[in-house]
């Protein structure tokens, strides 16, 4: 008997809930500021709205004319505010604020170009002729100029940056680095000393025995008896004991 009662109760409850609709339409609430508020529904809440005028999530789009705002983002003409130092200031506008200006004369962002003559400044970066200042030791000094400041100079005689070449005869020094003939100095103890020369100073020598720069190689480095080296730059004498 108890089982029958439970079964009948379950059937009645199922019939009641079976007739209840699964989805319900949105229930209109209170209308505020010409906007229809809905608790839930199938309205297209996220359709595009005019800039700065979004009704918010859950609000009906209403009668917003989106097409009327399609040109809101086009450039608008600048509104002139105040004129300072022959420059027209604009709050906003479609003027060419970033046009090229003469060097050192930028009107700044948001300023109209004014009457800047860019064409007259096109040659500002050309070389200007140097202004002669003072002559020292036969060298002409210039503050700036288009002279050939970095032309080759004679060895040990560089005029420095900004100095004119002067009368340096570069062609006359073309052989300065050619080998010069050796100059014999004083002869001491039967040994010949040389200041410089065109000899092959850097010929291969035995390890640890370099004659040094400016010394004639001669036969200085013939094998000698232990403890009897003639020294660097000294010519060897043929007084070695013969084997």
From Swiss-Prot:
Residues 1-26 form the signal peptide. InterPro entries: CEP (IPR033250). One of its GO terms (cellular component) is apoplast. The keyword Flavoprotein does not apply. Keywords: Apoplast, Developmental protein, Hormone, Hydroxylation, Secreted, Signal. Disulfide bonds: none annotated. Coiled coil: none annotated. GO terms for biological process: cellular response to nitrogen starvation; nitrate import; regulation of lateral root development; regulation of leaf morphogenesis; regulation of root development; response to ammonium ion; response to auxin; response to nitrogen compound. Expressed in lateral root primordia and in lateral roots excluding the meristem region. Also present in the aerial tissues, such as leaf petioles and the shoot apex region. This is Precursor of CEP9. The lineage of its organism: Eukaryota, Viridiplantae, Streptophyta, Embryophyta, Tracheophyta. The gene is CEP9.
């Amino acid at each position: 008997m108890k089982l029958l009662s439970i079964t009948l109760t379950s059937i009645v409850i199922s019939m009641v809930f079976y007739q209840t609709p699964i989805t319900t339409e949105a229930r209109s609430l209170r209308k505020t500021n010409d906007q229809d508020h809905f608790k839930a529904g199938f309205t297209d809440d996220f359709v595009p709205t005019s800039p700065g005028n979004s009704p918010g999530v859950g609000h009906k789009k209403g009668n917003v004319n989106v097409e009327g705002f399609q040109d809101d983002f086009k450039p608008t003409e600048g509104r002139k505010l105040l004129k300072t130092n022959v420059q027209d200031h604009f709050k906003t506008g479609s003027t060419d604020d970033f046009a090229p200006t003469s060097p050192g004369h930028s009107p700044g962002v948001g300023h109209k170009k004014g009457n800047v003559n860019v064409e007259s400044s096109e040659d500002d970066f050309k070389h200007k002729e140097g202004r002669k200042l003072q002559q020292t030791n036969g060298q002409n000094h210039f503050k700036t100029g288009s002279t050939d400041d970095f032309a080759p100079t004679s060895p040990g005689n560089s005029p420095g940056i900004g100095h004119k070449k002067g009368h340096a005869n570069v062609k006359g020094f073309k052989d300065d680095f050619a080998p010069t003939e050796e100059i014999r100095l004083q002869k001491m103890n039967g040994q010949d000393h040389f200041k410089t020369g065109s000899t092959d100073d850097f010929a291969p020598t035995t390890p640890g025995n370099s004659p040094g720069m400016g010394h004639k190689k001669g036969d200085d480095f013939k094998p000698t008896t232990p403890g009897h080296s003639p020294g660097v730059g000294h010519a060897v004498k043929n007084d070695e004991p013969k084997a």
